Amino acid sequence: MSIRIVPQEQLEQNGKSTPEGHIPPLLFANLKSLYSSRAERLRQLAADHPLGDYLTFAAGVVEAQQKVLHDHPLQLDLSNVLTQSGERPPLDIAVFPRDRHWLTLLRALIEELKPDASGQVLSTLENLEKASEQELEEQATALLQHEFHAENNDKAPFIWAALSLFWAQMASLLPGKARAVPGEHRQFCPVCGSIPVSGVVQLGTSSGLRYLHCNLCESEWHMVRVKCSNCEESSDLNYWSLDSENSAIKAESCGHCGTYLKLLYQEKDHRVEAVADDLASLVLDVKMEEEGFSRSSINPFLFPESSIE
């Protein structure tokens, strides 16, 4: 099964209603609390952590996103997007035209971060500030196409933070509802076509259900458990953790495609957060690489040094 977003009136015309016990195929981010909760979790994890300085840096970027979101709300009419997108995600990163709002967000993020920045971070922010719009657009396109270069990795978290904020704002404005339909490509976000940062096994009304968290638009989409989130095979899956079987963070590996994705279990620790806990558990990534598996996801604060397939 795949997930499509359709106009609300189309569901009503087809007589579709939400039955009792229905599994929500898609969860849009609550932007009022997303960034503040993430920043808080990053700062919690930073305490006595070997990567504490970087987690604190990431928290600062996320807090800047929260401020910029408040100061620069997106006003965009997306009423025709759902009917024009066809079988594609409505905000597909491969074809959706970016407007200059994302550059406004980037400039605002730089302005917000510069006063407290120093050293390499300050130098990177100043270089971004001096860059032409064409250079920034080219770097943004490269990131969205997963064309990574080590020499640009210092700029990537800031550019991605602006792009993510732009796409998250657009996702919140989509005038439609999601439904599960026959199809493939469940490994890609049904809103924007990007890939997950991690999977979250949830509590509450969605208790026990696995949702993949988009690393760009922050949406979450349902993916059944005990199935590889990358190739959808289920015959050769294993689960890895660093401490115990009851760990709140595990890596699900697939022997069929040779990749892994981290899963965060809210029932084990209700505080786990898709980006923060993934970033803070890099030791598990090292372990998985030693076992011969490749990461199928990308964290917005940790980009590969070279392009991936």
Swiss-Prot record:
Cytoplasm as UniProt keyword: yes
* Protein origin, superkingdom: Bacteria
- Specify where it is mainly localized: cytoplasm
Identify the Pfam families for this entry. FdhE_C, FdhE_central, FdhE_N
Give the UniProt family note.
Answer: Belongs to the FdhE family.
Query: Per its record, how is this protein called by name?
Result: Protein FdhE homolog
What Gene3D superfamilies does the record tag this protein with? FdhE-like domain
Q: Which UniProt keywords apply?
A: Cytoplasm
GO BP, sorted A to Z: protein maturation
Might you report a single GO cellular component term? cytosol
Which InterPro entries did the record assign?
FdhE-like_sf, FdhE_C, FdhE_central, FdhE_N, Formate_DH_accessory
Q: Tell me where in or outside the cell this protein is found.
A: Cytoplasm
